[in-house]
């Protein structure tokens, strides 16, 4: 059994009932085989893959809080500090009923490579809780966030671990979390990113993941003889990433014809109206049925189906494993030339393989959606220097970072004999930086 297979078998054995974590580790290790085989004896002696796939620290705790009826509620919470080899732990806090330790570990593992790809000094981590902010009053959300931070604050800090927003954790939640951290520590520091502009946040942070996705997609298309202008784009999701991916795609001359939420999806052949979408989702916090009701060219469909429409580029921006094998087949049949992941691991391994086998350009999430964490790191820089950059300054830095990410993953894929395999290129480029740092720092 090869070293890679031994490590994967150990991960499965020691982390039962964590399929998302298994999937993430399998995908990374498989694409690293060419790298590992060049130095297998050294990596085995140093147990480098074992240390890379095992979090440095896993923090599990309960979060008791009181609802509006006076009933005490208790939620499970997690913070997985995966790797600090290249900087303080960095990764979001997810608030969703589906959250469990396996999902947080998968996200933290992916985050390590994504953060490495940015070229910025940030390690990998992730956290969250099975608390659902949907349907809760502001007071209930505040009560949860304050209780959550009362335990979490012991393990984080501007130079230790810097959490951020994620699914379910927006500006409101970050504000409550930051307020409680400041209250407990009496320190005003850049311990969270995604903060409001009035207390240390960065311009362009809200737009960053969606904009960055399009900047990398644009670079990938250009390197393969295509341009984004004039392309028809299918986007899934209707949250932060999807909204600003739609906005930037249209600014670059593409036409986006779909968006989706948890109940259904919209097909709008005239092109998605970004202003209306933002009003429905960000202001009214309503379902997409209201978008369809307000726009004559739009048709609402219940259930899944975003990837059945004819498109040149597909951007899955909703959640993990949303783009399945049958979706990949539909995309290929409809002439799709490129897929770039806006969400974390939204494409199943079977779908990824099918797309690549059929010549579809494929940009994995750890590269394509790194714009969010890159801009979080830029927020950390501004906090450290007590500065605030303009929107255009941050956007220009983001565009350069995304162009560099594509250049690095493209070069890594070519160096190891896999030109055009951006999944392998992203994993290899991310791995090499982390591995070099781990070796330099000794057995820690």
Report each predicted region and the residues it spans.
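Glycine-rich phosphate/diphosphate-binding loop of Rossmann-like nucleotide-binding domains
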Residues: 193-196, 201-310
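Adenosine-phosphate binding glycine-rich loop
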Residues: 2-24, 220, 332-444
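Structured beta-strand/loop patches that form or line metal/cofactor-binding pockets in enzymes
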Residues: 42-71
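General beta-strand structural signal in soluble alpha/beta enzymes
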Residues: 160-164, 188-192, 235, 258-261, ...
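Glycine/serine-rich phosphate-binding loop and adjoining beta1-alpha1 elements at the start
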Residues: 96, 115-229
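Rossmann-like adenosine-cofactor binding region
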Residues: 264-362, 367
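Flexible, glycine/charged-enriched surface loops at secondary-structure junctions
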Residues: 19-22, 38-45, 119, 156-165, ...
């Amino acid at each position: 059994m090869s070293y890679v297979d031994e490590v994967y078998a150990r991960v499965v054995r020691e982390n039962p009932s964590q399929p998302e974590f298994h999937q993430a580790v399998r995908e990374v290790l498989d694409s690293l085989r060419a790298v590992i085989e060049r130095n297998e004896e050294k990596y085995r002696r140093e147990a480098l893959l074992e240390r890379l796939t095992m979090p440095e620290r896993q923090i599990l705790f309960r979060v008791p809080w009181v609802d509006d009826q006076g009933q005490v509620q208790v939620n499970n919470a997690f913070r997985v500090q995966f790797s600090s080899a290249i900087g303080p732990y960095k990764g979001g806090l997810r608030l969703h009923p589906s959250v469990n330790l396996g999902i947080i570990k998968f996200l933290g593992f992916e985050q390590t490579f994504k953060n490495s790809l940015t070229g910025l000094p940030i390690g990998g981590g992730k956290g969250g809780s099975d608390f659902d902010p949907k349907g809760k009053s502001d007071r209930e959300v505040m009560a949860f966030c304050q209780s959550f931070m009362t335990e979490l604050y012991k393990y984080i800090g501007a130079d230790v671990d810097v959490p951020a927003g994620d699914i379910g954790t927006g500006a409101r939640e970050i504000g409550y979390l930051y307020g409680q951290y400041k209250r407990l520590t009496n320190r005003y520091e850049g311990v969270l990113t995604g903060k409001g502009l009035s207390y240390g946040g960065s311009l362009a942070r809200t737009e960053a993941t969606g904009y960055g996705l399009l900047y990398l997609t644009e670079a990938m298309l250009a390197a393969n003889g295509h341009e984004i202008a004039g392309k028809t784009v299918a986007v899934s999701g209707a949250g932060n990433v999807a909204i600003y991916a739609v906005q930037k795609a249209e600014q670059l001359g593409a036409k986006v014809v779909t968006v989706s939420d948890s109940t259904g999806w919209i097909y709008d052949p005239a092109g998605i109206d970004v202003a209306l979408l933002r009003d429905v989702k960000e202001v009214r916090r309503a379902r997409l049925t209201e978008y369809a009701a307000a726009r004559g060219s739009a048709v609402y469909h219940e259930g899944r189906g975003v990837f059945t429409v004819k498109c040149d580029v597909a951007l899955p921006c909703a959640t993990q494993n949303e783009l399945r094998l049958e979706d990949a087949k539909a995309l290929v049949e409809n002439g799709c030339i490129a897929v770039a992941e806006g969400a974390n691991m939204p494409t199943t391994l079977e779908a990824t393989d099918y797309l690549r086998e059929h010549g579809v350009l494929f940009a994995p999430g750890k590269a394509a959606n790194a714009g969010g964490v890159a801009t979080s790191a830029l927020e950390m820089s501004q906090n450290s220097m007590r500065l605030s950059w303009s929107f255009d300054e941050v956007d220009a830095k983001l565009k350069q970072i995304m162009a560099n990410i594509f250049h690095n993953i493209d070069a890594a894929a070519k160096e190891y004999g896999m030109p055009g395999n951006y999944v392998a290129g992203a994993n290899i480029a991310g791995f090499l930086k982390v591995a070099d740092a781990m070796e330099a720092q000794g057995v820690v």
